Amino acid sequence: MKHLILTSILAIGLSTALLAQDQLRLAGGDISLLPSYEQYNTPYKDQQGATISDLVTYAATTLHWNACRVRLFVDPCVTNPDNGKRQGEVQDLQYVAALGKRIKDAGMYFLLDFHYSDTWADPVKQTIPAGWQSLSEAQLLDTMYTYTRMCLRALVDAGATPDYVQIGNEISYGMLWRGTSKNTTDKVYPRDSYTKNPANWERFTNLLSNGARAVREVCPDAQIIIHIERTADATACVQYFGNLNHYNVDYDIIGLSYYPFWHGRLTTELPNTLKALHGSYPDKPIQIVETAYYNNYWPTSGISYDTRETYPATPAGQDAFLGDLVTKLQEYDYVNGLYYWFPEENGCGGATWNANTIVIDDWLNRGLFDPNNHKAYAGLYRIGAYAVTPASVEAVSTDSRDANYYTLLGVSMGADRAQLPAGLYIHQGKKVHITK
């Protein structure tokens, strides 16, 4: 879909404002834990207290989201003998395929986030999967390719073809470390030139390239994202992607995490990094693939920037942050994605607290639902303002003479509703969600 210009005319009397693919702006959330909450019948309600029967459909139709992100672990049961129920480590391939299909059926874009680990991968943990630990470096490179290819093939077959693929999660310091963060010798350092440790940079970029090769083969229309979290350090970000370019890593989009309490202020650190990256790599769009803000308890440690004076740790402060973030990102035409991390957080799970229905042990207090009454916070409704979808209902109107159904990309699917696959369509100027 790269640089695809949509030219389909939907019907007689159709009024369109069709956008080029590179004008698309994605907005949504990483909803990786939603099915686990649903499994324990956790209620989701709108601001007025009305029940939301399906949050994925609600996101597409009411929140105006056009994309969702889902993480994928290799074998989460290895580190979680209770089948990974606690702490959110449940996202194996079968789980992700089912959730990915729901996202696609709702008419949204699907961002797949490969962790290449059995557990959380982030700047301090890039633990090699248990089943891969005995592999030689040559075998590991091959497994990076075959595993990525196998997963993507399974998702395509399940009707959950990813539109965007992250090769790793927050891989600022590399990936697939042998050993712990303290003793591994596999790290790369984003502020350093590759010349300081060429062996590690070559290992790391070869892994990335093998993952990217699998994406190009199985999902040729998907765009590849390289995701880091050094957003407070513009110099490190520029150096890092310069190192990747030296090794000819194949990717399309720069992905950043932006949590203001770790990565700096909306008025300084974030714009400085966005401008520096665009100035150095003008051919690479940028997406904020993770963001969030506290709605309640403010941690007593682990915080780099105290932003409470501007944005209190309250639902109103969270809402104000999201409103300002959307406004700020709209200033940069080279930023084309915004994902809220874990918006579905809704207490420990279940309608009321019960030790048998615990999805997570601890509340992060960054979700977009009140964990006590399960009502949506105002911030839930902010994110969709960033979205711009080609041929969206906001840009399409048809008259009653056109009986055809159209995808959100303007493709006619015919007039026989019974023959349509599940998904979100435009029919006579309205969004219609069809289920099977």
Regions found by a protein language model. Give the residues of each.
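C-terminal tail/sorting-segment detector
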Residues: L424-K436
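Hydrophobic faces of well-ordered beta-strands that scaffold small-molecule active sites
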Residues: L26-G29, N66-V70, F110-F114, D163-I167, ...
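Residue-level detector of functionally pivotal "anchor" positions at catalytic/ligand-binding pockets or at interdomain
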Residues: V388-L409
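Substrate-binding cleft and catalytic face of glycoside hydrolase catalytic domains
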Residues: A59-Q223, E229
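Boundary/entry segment of secreted carbohydrate-active catalytic domains
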Residues: Q21-Y58
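Glycoside hydrolase catalytic-domain groove-lining segments
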Residues: S53-A59, E202, E217-I224, T231-D306, ...
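Acidic-and-aromatic substrate-binding clefts and catalytic sites of carbohydrate-active enzymes
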Residues: Y37-A50, D75-P81, K85-Q94, S172-M175, ...
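Aromatic-rich peripheral "rim/lid" segments of glycoside hydrolase catalytic domains that contact
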Residues: K182, A276, D283, N296-D324, ...
